[in-house]
């Protein structure tokens, strides 16, 4: 299976944003975070935003293009449709619901068969979660200490997601509004990047 192989912290620094949420992600060895940034061209800004959005959700280029093409055909703002579809991927929902400490860990959980959707095992990270879908930790996986710890220590809640710790289940209540999605990116520039191709 294809993977994004660039070291996570290095990728965060090159994009200028902490896409993994780790407190040390933006630090260089022996240096403080941050450096003077050169002024980017219009194309450079669009490319940067595209790279940031791909990195946030861990999506490879070939699959990302499919999301963009679908978003361009959707009604309303294409950029908003793009980020909403990425937000509702199964691996991201597993992360947002608190089962995993990162999207990378969530993707591994899905790949290894730990996750059920509406009572059935789904091992495809890109599986699109629909409103009212129930996402659950498989019964035998509920005894894995790391997953228990992740769920119990989750401190961030989202209004568009409901999580029941006692039943190891989460549910997408509605499609999130753009301002509710905690991703620092100008998604409209991403659409502009691909619309010129």
From Swiss-Prot:
Residues 88-153 form the S4 RNA-binding domain. SUPFAM superfamilies: Alpha-L RNA-binding motif (SSF55174). GO terms for biological process: ribosomal small subunit biogenesis; translation. The keyword Transferase does not apply. CDD domains: S4. The keyword Acetylation does not apply. GO terms for cellular component: small ribosomal subunit. GO terms for molecular function: rRNA binding; structural constituent of ribosome. HAMAP family: Ribosomal_uS4_B (MF_01306_B). One of the primary rRNA binding proteins, it binds directly to 16S rRNA where it nucleates assembly of the body of the 30S subunit. With S5 and S12 plays an important role in translational accuracy. NCBIfam families: PRK05327.1, rpsD_bact. Part of the 30S ribosomal subunit. Contacts protein S5. The interaction surface between S4 and S5 is involved in control of translational fidelity. This is Small ribosomal subunit protein uS4B. The lineage of its organism: Bacteria, Bacillati, Bacillota, Clostridia, Peptostreptococcales. The gene is rpsD2.
């Amino acid at each position: 299976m294809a993977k994004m192989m660039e070291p996570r912290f290095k990728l965060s620094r090159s994009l200028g944003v902490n896409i993994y949420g780790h407190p040390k992600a933006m630090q260089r060895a022996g240096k403080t975070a941050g450096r003077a940034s050169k002024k980017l061209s219009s194309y450079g800004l669009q490319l940067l935003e595209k790279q940031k959005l791909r990195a946030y959700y861990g999506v490879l280029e070939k699959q990302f293009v499919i999301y963009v093409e679908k978003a361009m055909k959707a009604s309303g703002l294409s950029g908003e449709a793009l980020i909403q579809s990425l937000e509702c991927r199964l691996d991201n929902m597993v992360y947002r619901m608190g089962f995993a400490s990162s999207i990378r860990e969530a993707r591994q959980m899905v790949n290894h068969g730990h996750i059920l959707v509406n009572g059935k095992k789904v091992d495809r990270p890109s599986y699109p979660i629909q409103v009212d879908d129930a996402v659950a930790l498989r019964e035998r996986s509920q005894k894995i200490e790391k997953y228990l710890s992740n769920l119990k220590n989750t401190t961030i809640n989202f209004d568009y997601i409901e999580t029941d710790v006692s039943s190891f289940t989460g549910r997408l209540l509605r499609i999130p509004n753009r301002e509710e999605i905690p991703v620092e990116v100008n998604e409209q520039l991403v659409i502009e990047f691909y619309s010129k191709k």
